[in-house]
């Protein structure tokens, strides 16, 4: 089946975003299909982070639409959009273990300890860090810390 016959995982249509009365994004269009990998490249300040923050619901669009799996998400609460951002500054909690960092949002949601432990194991498998629950953040490489941040974002 050709990519164009599938519903896009992400579709951005005519997106306009302004910050402090200055238009940052003007009529941005982007379509990403399942299995595709893309890169956003450009100089500092050109709107890459603004675009991602808008998709994730951290910034509001003035016009246009953002669809995830065919459904518009602009009017959805941030936590229901199915989009997360892992920032360049990973903001991991250095005093917590890998497990503690990943389960942080799960605790806030009131998820039981057994379910949290299971979800942490699943997420560590997904990010290729199995069995590292008890490791301290300062014992990890930069790449491993990025994967912990990704697992934490997926847990949220």
PLM region spans:
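The feature captures the beta-strand-to-loop junction immediately N-terminal to the Walker
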Residues: 41-43
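Helix-to-loop junction immediately C-terminal to a conserved catalytic motif
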Residues: 56
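ABC ATPase NBD coupling module
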Residues: 72-87, 108, 113-117
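Short coil-to-helix segment of the ABC ATPase nucleotide-binding domain corresponding to the Q-loop/switch region
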Residues: 96-104
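Conserved ABC ATPase "signature" region
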Residues: 107, 114-132
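Conserved ABC ATPase signature
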Residues: 136-140, 144
